[in-house]
């Protein structure tokens, strides 16, 4: 099997941070070479843009915000993702372009056609081989976000914003079931872990 590009995504409060550890442990047990990274971020340029994008004091317009996301992504692809895949290393990214369709598209209202143009220009033919989409009901997401001490620029949004974000994620997953695995993360940790491991086992033929 060629090196796989895997993404982990979902609305805020879906449990990405917790379940990244599950994915890391899965790769470690099998001794597979893997690189973990994140968006926005993953490179010095990307991390600098991340600071701007997540800062509650940032007053960026929708187009500027979307362009910053894709600027960070282009640097990420060229500097991290493609070199790792070329070296035979699997890549797992905490968020990728699905998040832009969901947050800037669904949440903010950026036309999907405009995002698709940027996606094609920045990524060419690069798409994830597998996307693990963690999903929780809106009320669970909002409750978990509410427990966050310091909320970033997106976490400060209201429930209707996250309702639209979640809707786009689920619509994209339904339209491309061969790439997405929707994981119900509104369960206990062991059940979620077992679901993720089952998906990875099936994808890698373990």
UniProtKB/Swiss-Prot annotation:
Species the sequence originates in: Neisseria meningitidis serogroup B (strain ATCC BAA-335 / MC58)
GO MF, any single term: ATP binding
GO cellular component: cytoplasm; cytosol
Top-rank taxon, per record: Bacteria
Alphabetically ordered keywords of this record: ATP-binding, Kinase, Nucleotide biosynthesis, Nucleotide-binding, Transferase
InterPro entries the UniProt entry points to: P-loop_NTPase, Thymidylate_kin-like_dom, Thymidylate_kinase
Enzyme class: transferase
UniProt record similarity statement: Belongs to the thymidylate kinase family.
Protein's UniProt name: Thymidylate kinase
Reaction catalysis annotation: dTMP + ATP = dTDP + ADP
Listed HAMAP family: Thymidylate_kinase (MF_00165)
EC identifiers of the protein: 2.7.4.9
Function: Phosphorylation of dTMP to form dTDP in both de novo and salvage pathways of dTTP synthesis.
CDD domains documented for this protein: TMPK (cd01672)
GO biological process, one term: dUDP biosynthetic process
Binding site for ATP: 10-17
Pfam families linked: Thymidylate_kin (PF02223)
PANTHER family named in the record: THYMIDYLATE KINASE (PTHR10344), UMP-CMP KINASE 2, MITOCHONDRIAL (PTHR10344:SF4)
């Amino acid at each position: 099997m060629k090196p796989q590009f895997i993404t982990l995504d979902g609305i805020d409060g879906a449990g990405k941070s917790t379940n990244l550890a599950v994915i890391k442990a899965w790769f470690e047990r099998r001794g597979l070479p893997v690189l973990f990274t994140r968006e926005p971020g993953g490179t010095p340029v990307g991390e600098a843009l991340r600071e701007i994008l997540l800062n509650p004091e940032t007053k960026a317009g929708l187009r500027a915000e979307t362009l910053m996301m894709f600027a960070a992504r282009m640097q990420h692809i060229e500097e991290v993702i493609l070199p790792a895949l070329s070296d035979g290393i699997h890549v797992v990214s905490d968020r990728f372009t699905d998040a832009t369709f969901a947050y800037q598209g669904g949440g903010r209202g950026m036309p999907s056609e405009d995002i698709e143009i940027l996606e094609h220009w920045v990524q060419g033919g690069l798409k994830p081989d597998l996307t693990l989409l963690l999903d929780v009901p809106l009320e669970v997401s909002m409750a978990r976000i509410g427990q966050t001490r310091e909320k970033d620029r997106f976490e400060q949004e209201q429930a209707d914003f996250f309702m639209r974000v979640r809707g786009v994620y689920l619509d994209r997953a339904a339209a491309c079931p061969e790439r997405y695995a929707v994981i119900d993360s509104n369960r206990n940790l062991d059940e979620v872990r077992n679901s993720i491991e089952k998906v990875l086992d099936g994808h890698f033929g373990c």
